[in-house]
Amino acid sequence: MNKFSREAGEVVLLRAITKYSSQQGTLFFTSLRLVWVQSGYSEPSLHLHISEIKNQFISTPKSAKALLRLSVRDSIKNALQEFVFEFTHPTNARSDLNSFRDKIAATANLTAPTLPVSASNGSNTTSPTNGTSPINGTSPTMTGLKVNPDGTITNDPLSSQPAQVEEKAETKYLSKLKQPSLSEQQIKQRVILLQSNKELRELYEQMVNKDRVISESDFWESRKSMLKNDSTRSEKQHTGMPSNLLADVRPSSETPNAVHYRFTPTVIHQIFIQHPSVEKAYKANVPLKISEQNFWKKYVQSKYFYRDRSSANAPPVDDDLFSKYETDEQNKIRILKRKLIDINPLVDLSSTDGFDTDVHSGYGVLLDQSQDPNKLEKALPLLRKFNRHSALVLGSKDLLTNNSINIEKDQKNLKKTKKDENSTSTPTTTTTTTNTTNTTNTTTTTTTNNTTIKDPNLYNGDDEENISVEQMEKILENHKKLVNQHIIIDDLQEENSQTLTLLKISDQKRYFEGHSTNNILSDKEKSQLIDILDFDYKNWQPNLPQVFYQTHSSSSILQEPNISVHSEIFEPYNKAAINSKEEYNLPESSFKRDLFQSFHHCNELLRHFWATTFTLGRGAPPTSQQIDKNNKISSAIALQYDKIEEKKKMLISQNKVNQSSLFTPILESLHKAIEKKESQTNQYTFKNNNNNFHTIS
């Protein structure tokens, strides 16, 4: 077992019998790497350096198999690869697993991952490792903070020491948490937010770690918006449609009796995009008519039957769950065989250049014989699949318009009846479905009639005789209107001259003769008037002192003895006002820090107090946890009130009245909370006394 090519100075520390990729072998833990040697071989089939191991997961103690899953960083591809080993010793499999877990954690300086993952076979799940070593070093961006085993974040006094092992930032904040829903990214956001916000960090240390008045979850519950708006949150750009087609889902594992498939949300989304009939069937049947797991079983079975339709053992087409939702694909072929009655009479049917936008499929244009639907019936589904995917990649707005126009109106009524059904169906999550090998011969056959979807304006040749007279008259009337709109040209029509009302004036002299001759100036008078205007304009001088306001001298008034006496009286008040302005400036000092810290602490306590407070007779009665939390916060509010009251008295004794007044609003808010708590206590005591009185009587 120990015979394999070892490097210089390499020493084997642990070894165990394991399976990797369904092959039996031996796993070695050396001083330099992790080596797996397949049975019957002398050379290592797999070797992993300890420094490249980033995460490890183990199966739960209740699991039937002892599994070890390692996440290894590939230095070439710069991506994480996963390796799963199954310990197969008859008696010591679990102990071997624990030994490897502890050794890897101690050597690679790993922390316990936060999210459990599934094993490769899909039947056993793995959970985070329990015994891991703490972090020896800290990231430069996260100096002074560490994640405790209970999920809280505290200052680390040893963080200033040099790091023994240099690790990436994303691997430092994994810890063994009591909150399984807390992900690594959420921990990183919280730590970085506390590191960047000094006031929030002080509040967190005081309320959560030191006084333990508020729990970790309650503290972050009211700060979800800060985490969402935090700069650490990755701004993920929406990924477009990939250009490659999704291949058929491959089985994750196979056994003699069953084949296991794994449908991830990404795979399901791709299936819905590439196969609209599957999405329609899902919305119409899941979860009211059929379970999600059975739905994907039928989907896998339908793929088998679709592949084997030409064989003798294939079930009828109507047996497929998705057959009735594929009528829109079949209508593409049927529409070419329809005889159209309600057609545009202005369409040039002789146009065969292919560039006339008014000519559409079905208007009598001769088709290429190579595109005959009868000859391409087997190839058309594949061609439509490629064309539809190309349109999706390019973001075409008129995607498959011709395919959906015939079923749009018919599906409108169906959507109304199944609106409630579709609203209750939720997006699927990662699902594992099983398709047994015996289901091929035991599939139930159900006959469904494919209804022909008709457009009101399209009629088959058989339906031409069933058209009523009213429908034909309506069609002809529409044709007449359409023709009139195109044959009548407004520019060629005679203009209708409008008759205007004539202006009748009885005395035209009043409007057209002007002034009398006596008021008309002569030429000499006109020239004199122009000369006077020109002389005044050239000789004009501005007189600005007369325009401006002339102020009177007030020096004599200010020097009166009454004013001097008045200033002497108000001189102390003026000095006090000047001092108060300087006092309110609040430069950086211990008082300002103390004031802001007291304000934030009281604000946090009051927010949680009023969130957990209750009034007898109003709303649902509080739970025991809410009552305990309210009592704990009330005690903290009373202590905070006494501290601030002492600070205020001390400032008053130092003649800092204005500074002491800044604490008054805080004390008033705390006093209201204390009064509310006392009233609750009195009401509760009074109610209990009444109950005891009635019981005694």
Curated annotation (Swiss-Prot):
Residues 174-231, 255-307 form the BSD domain. Residues 115-136, 423-452 have a biased composition (Low complexity). GO terms for biological process: DNA repair; nucleotide-excision repair; transcription by RNA polymerase I; transcription by RNA polymerase II. It is found in: Nucleus. Residues 115-141, 228-250, 412-462 are annotated as: Disordered. CDD domains: PH_TFIIH. Component of the general transcription and DNA repair factor IIH (TFIIH) core complex, which is involved in general and transcription-coupled nucleotide excision repair (NER) of damaged DNA and, when complexed to CAK, in RNA transcription by RNA polymerase II. In NER, TFIIH acts by opening DNA around the lesion to allow the excision of the damaged oligonucleotide and its replacement by a new DNA fragment. In transcription, TFIIH has an essential role in transcription initiation. This is General transcription factor IIH subunit 1. It comes from Dictyostelium discoideum. The lineage of its organism: Eukaryota, Amoebozoa, Evosea, Eumycetozoa, Dictyostelia.
